[in-house]
């Protein structure tokens, strides 16, 4: 971790004359705000130190802003009166063309923008971050008291382990993650619909048995993303000792993929020829790249869609979302790869037992009430033009939450004895927290010191905690330069070594 500090630039001290000029400029700018807009007495030190431009958007820009018509509402305020939501990851901004748009949500309206010029503007109520892109050493500092932070992270926990630690996740006030406990859950993001589970008709078992007699393995492994936190290849390699596995991807490859087929195992699309090819297998090894409650991807849902049985490792609570009580084979329910192989061979030789895993394909055989209710109630859609996507959905969630918070703050200021101030929301570990990566097979203390997985993922996990605590320290000390992160991490390490908290 300390090696990462090498080569970092240091802040250039301001000369006295320049500092005096800046202070005068800030004083004049503050003085230009009406009392009700700035309210210095109600602001903490971090906001007093920040220059608050009246607007980064000109009058002409306000007038020409487009409008995303969501559910619609009775909010008739002008664009200049609306709170602003700043998308910090511009590449995820869910509107085009342009970088600013009015959004009309279920209960209220906001301006959404990816224009970072508005970061310090008083009306910028919330900053929305994409978890994969969030870096402690690039955070928008100083953090202003009047702004909330919102996190959108639907991808693997491996993309940013900072979010799996308490000091990291509690930086955010609103969350949209794969965890059901998040404010705007994306748990079933890879399941388009109930119909997706029911179709197509599986390859007949008689055909699968014929292919087995001709040499097709009972188990398919299709992975081209190797060396991941879940260490799945280590487990599959051990499993291969006890049962035949056809592996077509780059990981543990033992069979070439036909030239007319494209490996779409890591893609979001579903090429039909490839899907038909893999549907011939009885079992699909479906091991996620990261292990975390409710983290379930296409690796789980595609085999179910195709009428194959997923042999699954990923979410520890995956059974909560399965179509019925017997839809998938959970790897962690078996004491060893050998025991799992024996069970798969048993199913391979017993058609009646195997068919029980595909009963959900029949009408009215999907009995999981939680799954059915979640699909029915979610407001966003997957490849469904009749519903908003989850980016627009979360954006509107934040917009409505912020308008409610701001209204409650105004009511409290007008009648503090009658109206309580709004409660400050803060995310916790249940919104994202994922466990320390562990070996796919065996115990960590049995691994050689030069093991590539050991040298990578456990270290990444704990270094991410250092960065989360470092950013928390930057915010606590009202720092405005995020590159000071490494200095704060070093100072905390020194304090710990001296036995100080």
Swiss-Prot record:
Main localization (coarse): endoplasmic reticulum
Annotated compartments: Endoplasmic reticulum membrane
Recorded catalytic reaction(s): these are: L-threonyl-[protein] + GDP-beta-L-fucose = 3-O-(alpha-L-fucosyl)-L-threonyl-[protein] + GDP + H(+); L-seryl-[protein] + GDP-beta-L-fucose = 3-O-(alpha-L-fucosyl)-L-seryl-[protein] + GDP + H(+)
For this protein, the Enzyme Commission number is: 2.4.1.221
Which processes are annotated in GO (biological process)? positive regulation of protein secretion
Question: Which residue intervals are topologically Lumenal?
Answer: 32-501
Its UniProt pathway annotation is: Protein modification; protein glycosylation
Among PANTHER family, the record links this protein to:
ALPHA- 1,3 -FUCOSYLTRANSFERASE, ALPHA-(1,3)-FUCOSYLTRANSFERASE 11
User: Which residues have a glycan attached per UniProt?
Assistant: 173, 428, 478
Q: What gene is behind this protein? A: fut11
Q: Which Cys pairs are S-S linked?
A: 396-399
Purpose: Protein O-fucosyltransferase that specifically catalyzes O-fucosylation of serine or threonine residues in EMI domains of target proteins. Attaches fucose through an O-glycosidic linkage. O-fucosylation of EMI domain-containing proteins may be required for facilitating protein folding and secretion.
Any Pfam family matching the protein: Glyco_transf_10
* Name of the protein this chain belongs to: GDP-fucose protein O-fucosyltransferase 4
Which protein family is named in the record? Belongs to the glycosyltransferase 10 family.
Any Gene Ontology CC annotation: endoplasmic reticulum
Q: Name one GO molecular function term.
A: peptide-O-fucosyltransferase activity
Q: Which residues cross the membrane?
A: 11-31
The answer to keyword Transferase applying to this record is yes
UniProt topological domain (Cytoplasmic) ranges: 1-10
Keywords annotated in UniProt: Disulfide bond, Endoplasmic reticulum, Glycoprotein, Glycosyltransferase, Membrane, Signal-anchor, Transferase, Transmembrane, Transmembrane helix
Q: If you read the UniProt record, what top EC class would you report for this enzyme, in one word?
A: transferase
- Membrane topology qualifier: Single-pass type II membrane protein
């Amino acid at each position: 971790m300390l090696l990462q500090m090498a080569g970092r630039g240091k802040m250039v001290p301001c000369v006295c004359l320049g500092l005096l000029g800046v202070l005068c400029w800030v004083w004049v700018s503050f003085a230009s705000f009406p009392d009700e807009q700035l309210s210095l007495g109600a602001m903490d030190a971090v906001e007093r130190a920040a220059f608050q431009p009246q607007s980064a958007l000109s009058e002409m820009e306000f007038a020409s802003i487009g409008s995303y018509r969501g559910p619609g509402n009775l909010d008739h305020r002008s664009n200049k009166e609306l709170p602003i939501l700043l998308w910090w990851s511009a590449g995820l901004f869910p509107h085009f063309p342009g970088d600013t748009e009015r959004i009309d949500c279920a209960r209220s309206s906001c301006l959404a923008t990816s224009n970072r010029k508005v970061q310090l503007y008083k009306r910028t109520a919330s900053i929305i971050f994409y978890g994969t892109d969030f870096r402690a050493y690039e955070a928008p500092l100083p953090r202003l008291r009047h702004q909330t932070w919102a996190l959108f992270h639907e991808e693997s926990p491996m993309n940013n382990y900072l979010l799996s630690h308490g000091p990291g996740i509690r930086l955010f006030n609103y969350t949209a993650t794969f965890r059901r406990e998040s404010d705007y859950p994306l748990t079933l993001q890879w399941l388009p619909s109930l119909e997706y589970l029911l179709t197509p008709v599986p390859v007949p078992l008689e055909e699968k048995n014929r292919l087995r007699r001709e040499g097709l393995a009972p188990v398919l492994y299709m992975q081209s993303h190797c060396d991941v936190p879940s260490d799945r290849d280590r487990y599959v390699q051990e499993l291969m000792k006890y049962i035949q596995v056809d592996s077509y991807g780059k990981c543990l490859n033992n069979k070439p993929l036909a030239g007319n087929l494209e490996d779409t195992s890591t893609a979001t699309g579903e090429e039909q020829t490839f899907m038909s090819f893999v549907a011939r297998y009885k079992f699909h090894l479906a091991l996620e790249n990261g292990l975390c409650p409710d983290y379930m991807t296409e690796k789980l849902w595609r085999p179910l869609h195709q009428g194959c049985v997923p042999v699954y490792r990923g979410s520890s609570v995956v059974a909560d979302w399965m179509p019925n009580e017997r839809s998938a084979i959970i790897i962690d329910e078996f004491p060893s790869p050998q025991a799992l192989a024996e069970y798969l061979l048993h199913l391979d030789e017993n058609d009646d037992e195997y068919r029980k895993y595909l009963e959900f394909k029949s009408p009215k055989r999907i009995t999981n009430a939680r799954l059915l209710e979640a699909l029915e109630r979610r407001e966003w859609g997957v490849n469904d033009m009749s519903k908003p996507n989850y980016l627009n959905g979360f954006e509107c969630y934040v917009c409505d939450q912020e308008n409610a918070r701001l209204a409650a703050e105004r009511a409290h200021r007008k009648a503090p004895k009658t109206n309580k101030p709004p409660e400050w929301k803060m995310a916790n570990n249940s919104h994202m927290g994922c466990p320390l990566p562990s070996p796919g097979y065996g115990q960590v203390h049995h691994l050689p010191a030069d093991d590539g997985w050991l040298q990578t993922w456990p270290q990444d996990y704990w270094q991410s905690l250092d960065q989360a605590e470092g950013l928390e320290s930057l915010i606590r000390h009202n720092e405005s330069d995020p590159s000071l992160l490494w200095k704060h991490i070093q100072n905390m390490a020194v304090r710990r070594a001296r036995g100080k908290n």
